Amino acid sequence: MAKDIRECLLEQVGKFHQWQEITYPGKTTEEIGGAWEVDYPAWNDIFDAFCHVLTQMNAEMADSVLLDEMVYLIARDNEAEGFIQETTSHPQWFECLCRRAAASNENEAKWQFAAYLPECSCSQEVRDIILDFAKDPNEYVSRRALLAMPALRPDCVEQFAPLFWERNCYSPELQEYQRIAVLVSLDAIHSDLLPQYLERAKQDGRSYLLEHAKRIEGGLAMNEKLSRPQFNQMDTTEKQTLMESLAARYDMTFLGLHTFDRWGQNCTTGIFKKDGREFVFVPGDTVTLGWE
C-alpha cells in the first residue's frame, strides 16, 4: 500500500520533470527564473498525490528519493505555497522535510520552511533549525528566518541583528530589506535595542527603511499613550480615536468603549472583534490584549 502511494507521487513528479526538460531544455531551475512552474497543466494531479502521501503514509517510511522529490515540489510551488501549507498539518512529515530542505540547495523550499515553522507543532529541535536558516547565504532565506525568529527563538533575535545590519554581501536593495527585517524582528520582541536601530535607520536614509522605522515609532508612541495614566487623562473622543487606531494597527474591528467598576474605580476599556471573537483591551503599564 505504502509503495503504491509512493510510486504514484514519484510518477507524477516524473511527468513534471519531463515537462520541464521539454519546455526548458538543458536549463536548471535557477537558469529558467521567474514563476515558470505555474504553466504546468497537471498541478492538481501532483497535489492530490502529495496529499495522499501525507495522509496515508508514515513519514518514517520515506526514503531519501521520496523526501528529495517532496522538497523539490514544495520549492516549485513557491508562488501558491499550497504544498507547504498542507504539510504544516502533518508535523511528522513537516519535521522530516524541514530537515531535508535545510540540507539541500532548494532555496525556494528553505524560505517556505523558515516562514511556516511557527505554524507547525514541531519539536524544539526542529524549531531550532530557524537558526540555521538565518545563517543561510541566500538573502531571502535568511531574511524570512529572521522574521520568523521572534515566534521561535526570541532569545536569539538580538544576536542576529548586528549580522543582518552590517553585512555588505548583497546589493544595496537587498541590504535595505535585511535592515528592515532587523527593525521588524526587534519590534516583535520589544527589544531594548530597537531605539538605537531606529536611529541607525534614520542615518541610513533609504526610503523603505525610513518608512518602516516611522511606522514602528508610531506604534511605540501609541503604546505609551495606552498606559493607564495617560489613557485616563484623555476625554472620550480622544479615547475613541486611540482605540480606532489600535484596531487598525492590529487588523481588528473596534466595537466601542465600555466603562466598568474595578476596585472601586471607574475604568474605561475598548471592546474589539477579530476572527469572530470579541476581546477587551485593558490599559496598563504595558499593552495587554486578552481574549474574553
Which role does the model predict for each range below?
Residues 97, 112-113, 129, 144-145, ...:
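Alpha-solenoid helical repeat scaffolds
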Residues 57-68, 90-103, 122-135, 154-168, ...:
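Amphipathic alpha-helical scaffolding segments comprising HEAT/armadillo-like alpha-solenoid repeats
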Residues 225-292:
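Extended beta-strand/loop cores of jelly-roll/beta-sandwich
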Residues 105-106, 137-140, 171-175, 205-206:
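Short inter-helical turns and helix N-cap capping residues of alpha-solenoid HEAT/ARM repeat scaffolds
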Residues 93, 108, 125, 140, ...:
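Structural detector for tandem alpha-solenoid helical repeats, activating at a conserved register
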Residues 77-81, 110, 142, 175, ...:
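Residue-level detector of extended alpha-helical repeat arrays and alpha-solenoid scaffolds
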Residues 1-120, 124:
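Extended repeat-based scaffolds of very large eukaryotic assembly and lipid-transport proteins
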